[in-house]
Amino acid sequence: MNGSFDSGGLRLQRHLTRPAGRPGATSGLILCHGFPFGPIDARQSGGTFPELIDRVSSELGWVAMTFTFRGCGGSEGDFSLQGWVDDLRAAIDHLIAETSPSGIWLVGTNTGGSIA
């Protein structure tokens, strides 16, 4: 399910998937995209991640979310490394508020993996 959450007054885009037929607390996963290598890449960062998140949720039975950091994709703001750290903290808070997972795994590619 597509949606958004706030990070430091900025609106960030996210994709959140809940496993079908799994009532109660499950593990959670947040997938973070890497650093964009130009304007086109910045608009498309994490573009295929929603499909991967849907698959993780379906196959593992976990709540799973991906989002675009500030300055990327449909998210507001401009890049800053500290901003990306703040964005991940806000994503964790959002996942907890929305789904109450039993625990959260943080994974990512490139810079997103380093921040996670």
Question: Residue ranges of each PLM-predicted region?
Answer:
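Hydrolases whose catalytic domains are alpha/beta-hydrolase-1, hotdog thioesterase
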Residues: 115-116
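Glycine-rich "HGGG/HGxG" loop immediately N-terminal to the catalytic nucleophile
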Residues: 67-81
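Alpha/beta-hydrolase active-site loop
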Residues: 48, 78-99
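N-terminal cap/lid segment of alpha/beta-hydrolase-fold proteins
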Residues: 1-24
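Short, glycine/serine-rich, charged loops/turns that create anion-binding
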Residues: 36, 71, 111
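Alpha/beta-hydrolase fold nucleophile elbow
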Residues: 99-110
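Short, surface-exposed "cap/lid" segments of acyl-processing enzymes
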Residues: 21-59
